[in-house]
Every structure is written in structure tokens, then in C-alpha cells.
Curated annotation (Swiss-Prot):
Glycans are attached at N315. Coiled coil: none annotated. It comes from Homo sapiens (Human). Keywords: Endoplasmic reticulum, Glycoprotein, Glycosyltransferase, Membrane, Microsome, Signal, Transferase, Transmembrane, Transmembrane helix. InterPro entries: UDP-glycosyltransferase, UDP_glucos_trans, UDP_glycos_trans_CS. This is UDP-glucuronosyltransferase 2B11. It holds the Pfam family UDPGT. One of its GO terms (biological process) is estrogen metabolic process. The lineage of its organism: Eukaryota, Metazoa, Chordata, Craniata, Vertebrata.
């Protein structure tokens, strides 16, 4: 071992003794795509603070290579799917998702449920592969981890925590209908003023919108399921050797790190073991690559527009690409378009195509005037952080809801990807660039995001570090988790009080009838006399 690495290891060990906390061993149940990108930001910060982080991932994991040099440790377990097969399945499901007609409530959510069930069948198989692998489980037991860190959208982290008898912390953006947040996290979302996620409503609802919101709540409560819950409940019961459910196991999480922020989310109640850490991945812009910087500078006073539909959508039809290219060619700004496909015929001289762009650095550039986005949460937080108004072209899942939030806050214009014309896109860009109100509104949100007593990333890491030495955070866990559904809604108390009232009414009624009978009998007797 070189002197350099010996010094590094010595410094890490010393930091364990002289820092405010102690170094811990963190086991991570790996997520995919943007979920993994968010987790990785927190994990890197944990490593910098001297903690040992081990990522448990399947051999089919998409976004990272365990063989790459990294400060993270990887424990890879074999699974039946290959990386290519898993990626192809994800891409097929994303395409199905994007193609669902959004004008029909029942059709949209029934097909969305079908897609989610197929994906969660794969996730359950991944979970089975790891808990049934005696070699891997023995190694995990012997490693004596202090905590499990997982994304609640990808179940199994909580099962591993139960098997290893350690505490766990969740990272979560949201689940459809706030299902997991309500049933496992105990969070409260009054439908009278909190729009259910994926409803595309704001918190300023009319009467009919509140009716619509209530219908959404009932639908997600009694009909929609993210996965086949019976299979998950049976699987968890078999593994743990006692009757249990997925929601019950997830409900034992010590801390919920919600990737939300009051600059983005509508105000609503939340619990002591929940913290909003949305935007923790945002950071000041770094210098752009030389060629890209020269192109940006060539825009002069007009500035540039950044355009990205995310990493999952890798291609689009030639017709849609040309509709977009035609609109972009007519604006005075230069355009940097993340696009992985054939060059559109209508592409203007002011537009350059890139397979990848440093999105955060571009949004933080002083010449950036607008951001055309699909509405992914990470991109929206970066736009808020840097104060860039948006044109939203949502595609699927939470994206329409995210753009609805930004539109309600006056920071974005929304378009429909499948029906928008070149004129629609052109007018939307002119609106967010030339109307100063959009810039003012996004700057208000940016100041809110920046003006926090503790940075979101520091808070996220703090709670993970807090749970390890304290062996949990039971003092923050509300007693609602220990109640049955009828106790939670006080139905037993209401029933008891109604029974008491009914008993009193019954006794009073009987007493009155008895008195009436007595007086009537006395009256008849007096008449006979």
C-alpha cells in the first residue's frame, strides 16, 4: 500500500474519533435511474464524512458498474435477468407509459397499474434472489451493519433490515396516491385542501375540483395498487416466519427523507420523523466544456435555451422532432438540445444537439433564459435553484403533476407533447422569456430554496448519522402506527359514544313510556272511582 493511501485511511479513521459522531457502516438497497442518482449524492457525502457505505445491487443493475473505481463498496448478487434484458424491459414499459391516452382517467390509471405490477414483479424477484442467497446473507450478517438506507419505491430494504435486526431510513419522492406515505409513513393529506399526487390539481381548488380530488383519493384507497400486495405480504410473511404485510414492515422506518421542498410542494402537515430534503443534489454551476462555452457565449444578449426530456426517453418520432426543431429555429436564442436520435430536417442553425449535457451547469449559466423540460423532479429543482423559468412538456408518471405545481406557482407554461404544434412551443418560449413575471416568480422560489437554516444535503446526512448511534428514532415515531384502521379513525370510540347515547335515549324513552303508562293507568282508575 502506498504512503498516499495509508495517509488517506489514517485520516478517515481519525475523523471517526474527532468528528461530532462516529463512523458507521451503511448498507444500501440500490435503486435505479434518477432514484439512484439521488441516493448516490447522499452516499458520497456519507463517505466523505468517514462512513463505510456498501451498495447491495443485482447483477442486472443499469446505471452503475461495480467494477469501476469508486469510494463506494459494492456487493453484487446474481439474478436471472441480464443487464441488457432489464434495461430493455424498462424502456418498453416507459414507451408504453408515454403512449397511454391521458384523456381517460380509468384507462390511464388501469394501464399504469398494469405496468407497475409487471415492474414490481421483477423487483420482488430481485428481493427473493438476495434473501434466498445464503452466501450473500451470511456475509451481510457478518458485516454487522448499523443501518439500511433505501428508496421506498424499491421494496426490500425494509425486509433486509428486519432480517439483519437493524434500523432503516427511507428516501422517497412520492408514490401514486400517496399510498405508502399514508399507509406506512402515517402522513396526513386532507383532501379538502391537499391535491392528491398525480391529480394535476393545485391547493386552490374549486368545489368541483375538491369533488374530483375526493374521487382520486377513494380510487387510490380502494382500487389502485402499485403492485400485487397479496404476493408481497405472503412473501414477507414467509421470509420473516410470522404474519405481516409490506406496509407494516415499511412502517417501521425510523426516518423518512422526502425529496420535496416547500419551494415545490404545496403546504401540508407532516410528522416529526419526516424531513423535506428536496433539491439536495443541486449545487453551484461549474465551468462548461470549452466548445459548449463558446457556443453559449455566441448567443450574445439573447442568451440560450436548455432543452432536455431526461435520460429515460432516448428517442422520438421524426414528426415530433421536426415540430420541435421548427419552433426552436424561430427564436433569437441559441438552443442546447439533449437529443439521441436522427438529426431533424427542420433543425435551425441556432440549435445544437448533444447526447448528454451538463444540465445543472447550463441552468446555472448567466446566459440561460429558459428550460424546456419533461418535468422530472431533479431538473425542476435545478431550475428552481438557479432561477430559470420553464416550458413543461410532461410525458408520464409524476411529470404532469410536477409541471402543474410549477404552473400554479407562476414559474412554468405547460404543453402536451403529443398535440402541441410549433406555434404552441414558440409562443410558450416567448411567454416565459419575455414576460418578466415568470422570472420574478421562479426567483422567489429560488430564494426560498436557498434560504434554509441547514442545507438539505446536510439534513439528510444528519438523520442517517443520528439513527446509527441512537439505534433508531422511536421518540419521533407517532403512536398511529400501533393502531388498527378503525382505532386510527376513532370508529371504536365513535361507536362506543353512539352506543352510550342510544342507551341513554332508550332508558329515557322507556322511563317516559313507563311514566305515561303509570299516569294513564292512574287516570283510568280515578274515572272508575
Amino acid at each position: 500500500m502506498t504512503l498516499k493511501w495509508t495517509s488517506v485511511l489514517l485520516l478517515i479513521h481519525l475523523s471517526c474519533y474527532f468528528s461530532s459522531g462516529s463512523c458507521g457502516k451503511v448498507l444500501v438497497w440500490a435503486a435505479e435511474y434518477s432514484h439512484w442518482m439521488n441516493m448516490k449524492t447522499i452516499l458520497k457525502e456519507l463517505v466523505q464524512r468517514g462512513h463505510e457505505v456498501t451498495v447491495l445491487a443485482s447483477s442486472a443493475s443499469i446505471l452503475f458498474d461495480p467494477n469501476d473505481a469508486s469510494t463506494l463498496k459494492f456487493e453484487v448478487y446474481p439474478t436471472s435477468l441480464t443487464k441488457t434484458e432489464f434495461e430493455n424491459i424498462i424502456m418498453q414499459q416507459v414507451k408504453r407509459w408515454s403512449d397511454i391516452r391521458k384523456d381517460s382517467f380509468w384507462l390511464y390509471f388501469s394501464q399504469e397499474q398494469e405496468i407497475l405490477w409487471e415492474l414490481y414483479d421483477i423487483f420482488r424477484n430481485f428481493c427473493k434472489d438476495v434473501v434466498s442467497n445464503k452466501k450473500v446473507m451470511k456475509k451481510l450478517q457478518e458485516s454487522r451493519f448499523d443501518i439500511v438506507f433505501a428508496d421506498a419505491v424499491f421494496p426490500c430494504g425494509e425486509l433486509l433490515a428486519a432480517l439483519l435486526n437493524i434500523r432503516f431510513v427511507y428516501s422517497l419522492r412520492f408514490t401514486p396516491g400517496y399510498t405508502i406515505e399514508r399507509h406506512s409513513g402515517g402522513l396526513i393529506f386532507p383532501p379538502s385542501y391537499i391535491p392528491i399526487v398525480m391529480s394535476k390539481l393545485s391547493d386552490q381548488m374549486t368545489f368541483m375540483e375538491r369533488v374530483k380530488n375526493m374521487i382520486y383519493v377513494l380510487y387510490f384507497d380502494f382500487w389502485f395498487q402499485m403492485s400485487d400486495m397479496k404476493k408481497w405480504d405472503q412473501f414477507y410473511s414467509e421470509v420473516l416466519g410470522r404474519p405481516t404485510t409490506l406496509f407494516e414492515t415499511m412502517g417501521k422506518a425510523d426516518i423518512w427523507l422526502m425529496r420535496n421542498s416547500w419551494s415545490f410542494q404545496f403546504p401540508h402537515p407532516f410528522l416529526p420523523n419526516v424531513d423535506f430534503v428536496g433539491g439536495f443534489h443541486c449545487k453551484p454551476a461549474k465551468p462548461l466544456p470549452k466548445e459548449m462555452e463558446e457556443f453559449v457565449q455566441s448567443s450574445g444578449e439573447n442568451g440560450v435555451v436548455v432543452f432536455s426530456l431526461g435520460s429515460v426517453i432516448s428517442n422520438m418520432t421524426a414528426e415530433r422532432a421536426n415540430v420541435i426543431a421548427t419552433a426552436l429555429a424561430k427564436i433569437p436564442q441559441k438552443v442546447l438540445w439533449r437529443f439521441d436520435g436522427n438529426k431533424p430536417d427542420a433543425l435551425g442553425l441556432n440549435t445544437r444537439l448533444y447526447k448528454w449535457i451538463p444540465q445543472n451547469d447550463l441552468l446555472g449559466h448567466p446566459k440561460t433564459r429558459a428550460f424546456i423540460t419533461h418535468g422530472g423532479a431533479n431538473g425542476i429543482y435545478e431550475a428552481i435553484y438557479h432561477g430559470i423559468p420553464m416550458v413543461g412538456i410532461p410525458l408520464f408518471f409524476d411529470q404532469p403533476d410536477n409541471i402543474a405545481h410549477m404552473k400554479a406557482k407562476g414559474a412554468a407554461v405547460r404543453l402536451d407533447f403529443n398535440t402541441m404544434s410549433s406555434t404552441d412551443l414558440l409562443n410558450a418560449l416567448k411567454t416565459v422569456i419575455n414576460d418578466p413575471l415568470y422570472k420574478e416568480n421562479i426567483m422567489k422560489l429560488s430564494r426560498i430554496q436557498h434560504d434554509q437554516p441547514v442545507k438539505p444535503l446536510d439534513r439528510a446526512v444528519f438523520w442517517i448519522e443520528f439513527v446509527m448511534p441512537h439505534k433508531g428514532a422511536k421518540h419521533l415515531r407517532v403512536a398511529a402506527h400501533d393502531l388498527t384502521w378503525f382505532q386510527y379513525h376513532s370508529l371504536d370510540v365513535i361507536g362506543f359514544l353512539l352506543a352510550c347515547v342510544a342507551t341513554v335515549i332508550f332508558i329515557i324513552t322507556k322511563f317516559c313510556l313507563f311514566c305515561f303508562w303509570k299516569f294513564a293507568r292512574k287516570g283510568k282508575k280515578g274515572k272508575r272511582d
